[in-house]
């Protein structure tokens, strides 16, 4: 009969955290940024089909970094949960806070009970009425969740990007300024200029008359915004 060697719980959690951090750090970053008319999610992503940024529901968007298959599973689960809640109660009852809590619980369970944690960090954003109704929730691989204000960066070079955003961010930017600044910040750790074709971006635009506030920015529009 063989026995598994004893590992202290603290060491086990530390090892899982380090494993997840390494996986996430290998991925390209995502920035979430409030601007005058809503919320911008932007990332360096040359793929035209494997999206990091997506719509979840009418006023709610999702962004993920790390292992694509894992944050894609979370995105799909979030859409299903939002659809179910909207159908059962009402579309106005679907809130980003509730989705963030559901993601937090799921990731916490995976982190503590499964052998391998998810190598992901995700953002859930929401717009409502005016600027005071904008929300950004940052959920970590272990289920920790924080309510961010103004801006947030996740993925590789997270600390450098956050520091740069902290130095430069100003509330009330128009979309062009927000896109230009975010693109410059994304390329700053390596001193690179990121071209429009390598940028993925989407906005939650509260000024849209449609019920669905999410809009994906296509390459020609991104190029125009970068030119100012």
Segments predicted by a language model, with ranges:
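Long, low-complexity N-terminal extensions
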Residues: 1-228
């Amino acid at each position: 009969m063989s026995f598994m060697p004893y590992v202290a719980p603290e060491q086990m959690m530390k090892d899982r955290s380090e494993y997840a951090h390494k996986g996430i750090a290998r991925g390209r970053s995502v920035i979430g940024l409030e601007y005058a008319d809503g919320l911008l999610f932007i990332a360096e992503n040359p793929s035209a089909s494997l999206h990091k940024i997506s719509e979840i529901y009418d006023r709610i968007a999702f962004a993920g970094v790390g292992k694509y298959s894992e944050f894609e599973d979370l995105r799909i689960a979030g859409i299903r949960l939002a659809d179910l809640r909207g159908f059962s109660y009402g579309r106005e009852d679907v809130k980003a806070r509730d989705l963030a809590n559901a993601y937090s619980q799921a990731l916490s369970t995976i982190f503590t009970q499964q052998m391998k944690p998810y190598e992901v960090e995700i953002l859930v954003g929401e717009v409502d009425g005016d600027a005071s109704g904008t929300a950004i929730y940052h959920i970590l691989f272990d289920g920790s969740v924080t309510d961010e204000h103004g801006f947030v960066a996740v993925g590789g070079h997270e600390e450098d990007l956050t520091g740069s955003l902290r130095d430069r961010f100003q509330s009330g930017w128009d979309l062009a300024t927000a896109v230009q600044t975010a693109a410059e910040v994304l390329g700053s750790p390596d001193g690179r200029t990121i071209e429009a074709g390598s940028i993925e971006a989407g906005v939650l635009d509260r000024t849209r008359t449609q019920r669905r506030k999410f809009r994906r920015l296509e390459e020609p529009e991104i190029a125009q915004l970068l030119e100012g």
